[in-house]
Each structure stands twice: as C-alpha cells, then as structure tokens.
Amino acid sequence: MSVVVKICGLSTCDTLEAAVAAGADMVGFVFFPASPRHVGLDVARELSDQVGSRAAKVALTVDASDALIRDIVEILKPDLLQLHGSESPERVRALKQAFGLPVMKAIAVATAADLAMLPAYAETADRILFDARPPKDATRPGGLGMTFDWELLRDLDLSLPFMVSGGVNPGNVAAALRVTGAGGVDVSSGVERAPGAKDPELIRSFIRAARASEELMT
C-alpha cells in the first residue's frame, strides 16, 4: 500500500527543499495569520516556483473568503484546497465549482459524535483529513501537536480517500497508519523544533518512517 505523505506548514526554502527531496507527495502552505506557519502571498509565490511539479501543492485556509482564495490560487497555483475551518458541505461544493480544484476537508475529532457529518462531506469533498479537535480556547484549528483516539477510525466505511493528522511524528506515524487504515498522513508540528520552525532532519525521519510502514501494510 502506497501512503500519501504531506508535510504541512512549510514556510522556508530550505525546509521545503528537505521535504521535496525526501519524497513528500504533498507540501502544504498555511494562509491563516493566527498560525506561526502562516505565509504571505509573496513568500507563497517564491515557494511555489521552487516546488514546480515535484510535489502536489496544498493551500490551507480557515473559513477564508472567496477573494482571498482567489488570490492564493492565482499565486500559488495549488493542486488541492485544504479547508481547515468550519466550512459546511455546501461551502465545499461552492468552492469546488468556483475554482475548479479538488478539496480536502478537515474534520476535527475528539469523539465518535464528530464523525456524524462525514456522509454529507463525502458527497462534496474529494478527500477527508481527520485532525484532533482543539481545545475550546485555541486560537487555531490545528498544528497543536494533539492526537486523538485513532481507534475511532478503525474499519471506517468511507468512500473517499482519507488522511490522518494531529500529533503524528516520526515515532508514532506507523501506528497511526496501521490503526486507522488511512491512505495518507499529514504532519506539521511533529517535524518542528519550535512552533513554525520545521526541522529538516525531522522531516526526513518522518518520511522514512511513513515509507517503512508501507511494507508492513502490504
């Protein structure tokens, strides 16, 4: 089984190069000022040029306006839109139609009740990302290093490809994939030495661990 590996929250040329050179399938860029991983449009343009076609580019937004997404699409030229806020299934459909791009919708998970909206999102999104539900007082919806109970996803009956995130790191990524049966994994804080500061060696270690898990899942 081939695992899709996404390194999210990249903001510098050297860490982006580390991710691409190590074989990341997707590289994510955060457009959300409250995040320490936020990048402006000028930086996004530079990073987009650096990636070229070597990896799929993912634009992460949180309840963003059409105008902002339009600017991001024009400059980053993403392959995938990642909606990490409270966007409804109808909003997912509208953005797909407006920009002609596939959408990955993030679902915040703490209990089984959080999966209730899956059928509705499965009708509109192209991919689902399961992330840990943040505390009520959190200022951002992800990248907090929190995990959730992966057993909630075991034997999940979902017609869409899905990825798992939330507190994954080089030491636990194999377990996350094994328990959830996810076809992909998304990491941000798990490859950082400080919030927003990606570590090239941790990036390489994470990708090696994810690739090693493929052999165990075949």
UniProtKB/Swiss-Prot annotation:
GO biological process, one term: L-tryptophan biosynthetic process
GO molecular function, one term: phosphoribosylanthranilate isomerase activity
Catalytic activity: N-(5-phospho-beta-D-ribosyl)anthranilate = 1-(2-carboxyphenylamino)-1-deoxy-D-ribulose 5-phosphate
Alphabetical list of InterPro entries matching this protein: Aldolase_TIM, PRAI_dom, RibuloseP-bd_barrel, TrpF_fam
CDD domains for this protein: PRAI (cd00405)
A Pfam family assignment: PRAI
Enzyme class: isomerase
Family: Belongs to the TrpF family.
Name recorded for this polypeptide: N-(5'-phosphoribosyl)anthranilate isomerase
Organism whose genome encodes this protein: Rhodopseudomonas palustris (strain BisB5)
